[in-house]
Amino acid sequence: MSFTLTNKNVIFVAGLGGIGLDTSKELLKRDLKNLVILDRIENPAAIAELKAINPKVTVTFYPYDVTVPIAETTKLLKTIFAQLKTVDVLINGAGILDDHQIERTIAVNYTGLVNTTTAILDFWDKRKGGPGGIICNIGSVTGFNAIYQVPVYSGTKAAVVNFTSSLAKLAPITGVTAYTVNPGITRTTLVHKFNSWLDVEPQVAEKLLAHPTQPSLACAENFVKAIELNQNGAIWKLDLGTLEAIQWTKHWDSGI
């Protein structure tokens, strides 16, 4: 079911990152009503740049670290919902790539995403009288097939794909739909230099960037196309400037 972003309210977690910033710019071209950016690092210059792209869209920034307790996330969302009244889309985009930082990688890439999602269900869940909503979770192609030298990062992205697929199946109960966008290797600061697990491959970043990559702008354009296609349960691959829906192979079924 296609979805128009015109006049919609969007919360973008990590909307100032590499792919995030370019995606925010693309979103603004769609004449949103509000773009609310939640990010750990304040970047007034980037916010000013975004505001200048489309003055018709209200761009708001709140500092947010996805590793905070869920009660703090709920408190922040209360502030946002009080201001906007409705929120149509949540984009969960926080991520780090550094397999030296095991606990933080899991906390940012997976636990933080789960907690932010859980918190917004307080406002969206139709069982609580909520209107429903749309969740777009940023995964990675490493969630399909790992970069084995960074197994912690790859494992968190596989978890994001699995969690989001479950959210999509719960949509008849909650009224909240969900899908993942999974970028391939994209030229951002995230991949210029990073650490492998236990230093199993000191040159992992250099070796990765020796293979075909995509610019973040091409990824951002397909990112927004995926949002507009709005397919509950979709597992989108955004690689080498293309957008493709992955057909996931079912090897087991719980039967419930």
UniProtKB/Swiss-Prot annotation:
Domain of life where this protein originates: Eukaryota
GO molecular function: alcohol dehydrogenase (NAD+) activity; aldehyde dehydrogenase (NAD+) activity; protein homodimerization activity
Annotated consequence of substituting residue 52 to E: In allele Adh-F'
Result after altering residue 184 to L: Complete loss of activity
Name of the coding gene: Adh
Listed result of changing residue 133 to I: Complete loss of activity
SUPFAM superfamilies from the UniProt entry: NAD(P)-binding Rossmann-fold domains (SSF51735)
Binding annotation for NAD(+): 12-41, 65, 157
UniProt protein name: Alcohol dehydrogenase
Outcome of swapping residue 15 to D: In Adh-N11; loss of activity
Entry GO CC: cytosol
Species annotation: Drosophila melanogaster
Record text on activity regulation: Inhibited by 2,2,2-trifluoroethanol and pyrazole.
Effect on the protein of changing residue 153 to F/H/E/Q: Complete loss of activity
Known outcome of mutating residue 153 to C: Retains only 0.25% activity
